[in-house]
UniProtKB/Swiss-Prot annotation:
Name the record gives this protein: Proline--tRNA ligase
UniProt xrefs under CDD domains: ProRS_anticodon_short (cd00861), ProRS_core_prok (cd00779)
GO cellular component: a single term: cytosol
Signal peptide: none
Enzyme class: ligase
Function comment: Catalyzes the attachment of proline to tRNA(Pro) in a two-step reaction: proline is first activated by ATP to form Pro-AMP and then transferred to the acceptor end of tRNA(Pro).
Gene3D superfamilies assigned to the protein according to its UniProt record, in alphabetical order: Anticodon-binding domain, Bira Bifunctional Protein, Domain 2
Catalyses which reaction(s): tRNA(Pro) + L-proline + ATP = L-prolyl-tRNA(Pro) + AMP + diphosphate
Places the protein is found: Cytoplasm
Subunit description: Homodimer.
Record-stated family: Belongs to the class-II aminoacyl-tRNA synthetase family. ProS type 2 subfamily.
Protein source organism: Cereibacter sphaeroides (strain ATCC 17025 / ATH 2.4.3) (Rhodobacter sphaeroides)
GO biological process annotation, one example: prolyl-tRNA aminoacylation
Length: 445
């Protein structure tokens, strides 16, 4: 993409309404525009980053054997009355009456609808286990939306639902989701810690939240520092193996890690003092096992091998896709702007032409643009007639992991400059070497 033809409405000044880093930089980098309290338009750069995050979520869900579908944003209220949650959910749920005086709602979550789909089409234990998921916009009418996409009213969320014959199978689904989430967050450059948490309005007997440590987090968290040394890495997981998934979950849940809602001071104080940590965390996902809480009242049952009809065991598993953009920026930035991890960057590399209109630099930049694209990379070429300082400031603000700088003196010597946004380190090399280096880096992501 050529910046002269792109829509990137960057701001030079910090917006007064932005209280935290991610909100400030997302507005300044032209990623989002507020349309109402807690409701945002996603501008091209933000939308591109959002789709990168969503793609990783899809890839890891499918890797774990989960099946995508798409449910509507509007739901009939009668489904929620069946489960008993329509009156319990509170004012966060946006209730709507259509022209035929039917009660509807803008879904804050989808347990009822997915249970209705299941009971309409699945009748036998032979069709289990089954996990369905979708990525869809949700709405919760927060009383005080703030912090940009971190606590908005409308948000993009992945929510998945497992249906299993018995407790043991449902716990395997729970473990499978935890493993899948650990891999998902690490691919995004995040260390998200699974912490035992409270179930809230969704309910259930077992739940973990995934939290990214950050001073701007809404939750107080208590944890054993040993958990921050754990890395998922590039291990290959057999998601069908109960033993393997259980072992990974045990590894990640043995060190103490809890939110303030489930914190146990006595257990925490038994940890050696040098490993006890208190911080704040941003919730980026949560998994639940809730047994037959929804299947029983809504009649989601299957016939077993001996002819008995039993309610299925269920769980739900959510990732805040749009919220992840804010969490990534909170965890990865400096005073100049965003620093995108390579796995989620909207563009792979920025090209800065120091002397637009100079035939040698123009030709070199065009060749770089063409060669990078041929390698499957997406460059953002700043071909604007702007001073070099303004171009560098824009690149630092939007935070692409790599920048190639092309100037007349370098071209005369057969060199370009490749700069790492995170470290600030620069290296001169030929254009071909820069292209090969970047292709190698991104091939491993």
């Amino acid at each position: 993409m050529r910046l002269s033809r792109y829509f990137l409405p960057v701001l030079k000044e910090n917006p007064s309404e932005a209280q935290i880093v991610s909100h400030r930089f997302m507005l300044r980098a032209g990623m989002i525009k507020q349309q109402a309290a807690g409701i945002y338009s996603w501008l091209p750069l933000g939308f591109k980053a959002l789709k990168r995050v969503e793609q990783i979520v899809h890839e890891e869900q499918i890797r774990a054997g989960h099946i995508p579908l798409l449910m509507p944003t509007l739901q009939p209220a009668d489904l929620w009355r069946e489960s008993g949650r329509y009156d319990d959910y509170g004012e966060e749920m946006l209730r709507i009456t259509d022209r035929h005086k039917r009660d509807m709602l803008y879904g804050p979550t989808n347990e009822e609808m997915i249970t209705d789909i299941f009971r309409s089409h699945v009748n036998s234990y032979k069709d289990l286990p089954l996990t369905l998921y979708h990525v869809q916009w949700k709405f919760r009418d927060e009383i005080r939306p703030r912090f940009g996409v971190m606590r908005g009213r409308e948000f993009l969320m992945k929510d998945g639902y497992n249906f299993d014959l018995d407790f043991d199978s449902a716990i395997h689904a729970y473990n499978r989701h935890m493993v899948s989430y650990l891999r998902t967050y690490e691919r995004m450059g995040l260390q998200a810690i699974p912490m035992r948490a409270a179930s809230g309005p969704i309910g259930g007997d077992n739940t973990h939240e995934f939290l990214v440590l950050a001073s701007t987090g809404e939750s107080e968290v208590f944890y054993d520092a040993a958990i921050t040394d754990l890395k998922f890495g590039d291990r290959v997981v057999d998601y069908d193996s109960r033993e393997e998934c259980e072992a990974i979950v045990k590894e990640w849940t043995t060190p103490y890690a809890r939110t303030d809602e489930t914190h146990d001071e006595a257990i925490f104080n038994a940890i050696p003092e040098e490993r006890r940590r208190t911080s704040r965390g941003i919730e980026v996902g949560q998994i639940f096992y809730f047994g037959t809480k929804y299947s029983e009242p809504m009649g989601a049952t299957v016939v077993t091998a001996d002819g008995a009809r039993v309610p299925v065991h269920m769980g739900s598993h959510g990732i805040g896709v749009s919220r992840l953009l804010g969490a990534i920026i909170e965890a990865s930035h400096d005073d100049k702007g965003i620093i995108w991890p390579e796995g989620v960057t909207p563009f792979h590399v920025g090209i800065v032409n120091l002397k637009q209109g100079d035939s040698s630099t123009d030709l070199a930049c065009e060749a770089l643009y063409r060669d990078l694209s041929a390698k499957g990379l997406e460059p953002l070429y700043d071909d604007r007639d702007e001073r070099a300082g303004a171009k560098f400031a824009t690149m630092d603000l939007i935070g692409l992991p790599w920048r190639i700088t092309v100037g007349p003196r370098g071209i005369a010597a057969g060199k370009v400059e490749l700069t790492n946004r995170r470290t600030g380190e620069s290296e001169e090399m030929s254009s071909g070497a820069a292209v090969d280096r970047l292709a190698q880096i991104y091939a491993g992501i």
